[in-house]
Amino acid sequence: MFKKDNRYVTRGVNEEVDIRLQLIMWSMIDKLKDEGNVELDYLQVFRIRKEGKKIVISQSQEVPEYSCTYEIEIEDVQIDDKIKVYVIDSGEYSIMLFTGEY
């Protein structure tokens, strides 16, 4: 699950989410998978918001229940509102998309 090849991003995410944040989300999934402490669910949910000069990224899944939050200092990323992104693994490929694109 969540192999490093065959990863896709929808046009909407690619246009609205900074590439650095996209790479951070993929890295968060890879880290969770590599550590092996938690079984990965096929659906990973990311919530992104800006707090001052920090970007806050919360990752969660339902089965088994898991969540963590990272704070990253990136000043030149513009986030006007909260962003919710799904990353879904189909077994053959993984795709990053907005909830409205599901």
Enumerate the predicted regions with their spans.
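Short, compact, well-ordered microdomains
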Residues: 63-102
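N-terminal "domain-start" segment
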Residues: 1-75
